[in-house]
Amino acid sequence: MYIPKHNRLEDKAEIYALMKHFSFATLITQNPLTATHLPLLLEDDGKIRGHLARSNKQWERLEGAEVLAIFQAGHAYISPSNYLSRDVPTWNYTAAHAYCAATLIHDEDAAVSHLECMVNLFESGREVPYSVDMNEDFYRRMVAGVVCFELEIVRLKAKAKLSQNKPLGTRQNVRLELEKSEDSLERDVAERMGKLE
């Protein structure tokens, strides 16, 4: 990923927070080049865990492979109508690229634990959270239909392209315009821009 110096994100805690909050990611493998959009969970141990449908043959290329997991935060079109001087439109965004070594999880109990963890995470905060009893035969049979994996981060790159190359007045105009948006992704960009002022 091309990252000019002024767009480089280096704070690991900030990058990890992005990866946890925007966990619906893109997993890319090679030979042939394949991408799958899926939830990936960054765990406290710094490893990323996920699963693919067994019918998705991408899992066959995971074991021992270098893979790329892309996490994308909010993004927004930036109109020159908010600039203080004449310029061109652009796009603001924040993204993290995790280059990883992949390992398949063969242990059924570990796979069950991963799936239970994922459901509990995404159900938390709901008024009536769905409860999973992974010991039930139904869920054990479902585990056979997926392949769980673990990704060890080898290299991590992150970029925040948030109009840092523009004058403060322009950045403020852009941020204020994005704050008015009904689109939560655009408001995320505004919030990230505000932290830079």
What kind of feature is each model-predicted range?
Residues 1-48:
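An N-terminal domain-cap segment
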Residues 32-34, 41-48, 54-57, 73-77, ...:
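Short, charged/polar surface micro-motifs in flexible loops or helix N-caps
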Residues 48-68, 179-184, 190-197:
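An N-terminal domain-start capping segment
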Residues 15, 28, 58, 84-87, ...:
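Catalytic micro-motifs at enzyme active sites that drive phosphoryl/nucleotidyl and oxygen chemistry
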Residues 103-197:
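C-terminal edge-of-domain segments
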